[in-house]
Design a protein with these regions (language model features):
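Internal alpha-helical scaffold of NAD(P)-dependent oxidoreductase catalytic cores
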Residues: 122-206
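Rossmann-like NAD(P)-binding element
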Residues: 49-76, 81
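Rossmann-like NAD(P)(H) cofactor-binding subdomain of soluble oxidoreductases
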Residues: 69-116
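Interdomain hinge/lid region at the active-site interface
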Residues: 194-266
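Glycine-rich, N-terminal phosphate-binding loop of Rossmann-like dinucleotide-binding domains
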Residues: 61-63, 85-86, 132
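Residues at the starts of beta-strands that form the adenosine-phosphate
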Residues: 2, 25, 100, 127, ...
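NAD(P)-dependent dehydrogenase/reductase Rossmann-like domain
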Residues: 234, 241-243, 247-311
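NAD(P)+-binding Rossmann beta1-loop-alpha1 motif at the extreme N-terminus of oxidoreductases
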Residues: 1-53, 57
């Protein structure tokens, strides 16, 4: 497939490298000359939007704040299939409504950015959401699912709304919490004593601020709802601490419940099974948190997470 990758940072660069290694005809596009020079050692590059016309697929990996310009200017008149890698999905669907668009989001990344941080195996074994709406062209969706599974990703069907709600809770909120933890611990002695717990809990606070700004701009309502849920949980913990003298087991029970839920992650996959590539089968798979590992002509090899009994 002839694929244009627009934006050659960590995610776009990694996708371009992986696709090139898989034998696809990759064209990189980036407005930054230094980035183009670095990428040119691996695949052809251009800074001219006119050069994208001969490609079959455009993978938009530009920062969120630039998506509107990419849709209206860089891809003006583009007739190929378009997908993106943004961490929010409802807003890109609106911006690219005039294109043949299927939203996507690879659940992979690092706290470092730029083409220098890109690696072709970044997505291997990682989940890659592909948005499946009632009006999504199933042929386009399947073509993208086949493409991303071919570089080792596990494709999860989901609606944009379902994705954005989940992403707010397992990704965007974590950036907010990491920044808050850094701010709470900003004392000389605390910083000297900080070790594993602080490092693990604050790792993503080292990410570029622009990354989080895109999450806020594109998913603010869901992020506020998730922040409210977190505040409620912290309020519960605070009440348990206040009641510790009279009810010392309450905070332990709160921790035990969280520990049990954490022990169930990541979910254990069931045996792989073939499913038809129909809208109904894919939607049902995504609704239970399942994913595709191999896409064939009319069927796909899929897995579902094991649901543990609560009895």
């Amino acid at each position: 497939m002839r694929v244009a990758v627009i934006g050659l940072g960590l995610i776009g660069g990694s996708a371009a490298l992986a696709l090139a290694e898989a034998g696809h005809d990759v064209l990189g596009f980036d407005p930054d000359p230094a980035t183009r020079d670095a990428a040119a050692a691996h695949f052809p590059v251009t800074g001219d939007p006119a050069g994208l016309a001969g490609t079959e697929l455009a993978v938009v990996a530009a920062p969120f704040r630039h998506l509107a310009a990419v849709a209206a200017e860089t891809l003006d008149g583009y007739t190929g299939l378009v997908t993106d890698v943004s961490s929010v999905k409802a807003e890109p669907a609106r911006l690219f409504a005039r294109h043949r668009f299927v939203g996507g989001h690879p659940m992979a990344g690092k706290e470092t950015a730029g083409f220098a941080a890109a690696e072709p195996d970044l997505f291997r074994g990682r989940k890659w959401v592909l948005c499946l709406e009632a009006d999504t062209d199933l042929g386009d969706w399947t073509a993208l699912a086949a493409l991303w599974t071919s570089i080792g990703a596990h494709v999860v069907p989901a609606t944009a709304a379902a994705h954005d709600r989940a992403a707010a809770r397992i990704s965007h909120l974590e950036h907010l919490v990491a920044a808050a933890l850094v701010r709470v611990a900003d004392e000389p002695l605390a910083r000297t004593l900080a070790a594993g717990s602080f490092r693990d809990g604050t790792r993503v606070a080292a990410s570029p601020t622009a990354l989080f700004a895109g999450m806020v701009e594109g998913n603010r309502d869901e992020l506020m709802a998730a922040a409210d849920d977190l505040a409620a949980e912290l309020g519960t913990a605070r009440r348990h601490l206040d009641a510790y003298t009279d009810w010392p087991s309450s905070i332990s029970e709160w921790f035990d419940e969280a520990r049990a839920r954490r022990a169930d992650w990541p979910p254990e996959p069931l045996a792989a099974q073939r499913i038809p590539l129909t809208r109904e089968a894919l939607a049902e798979l995504g609704a239970v948190g399942g994913w595709l590992e191999v896409v064939e002509s009319e069927v796909a090899l899929a897995r579902r997470p094991r649901v543990k009994s609560t009895s």
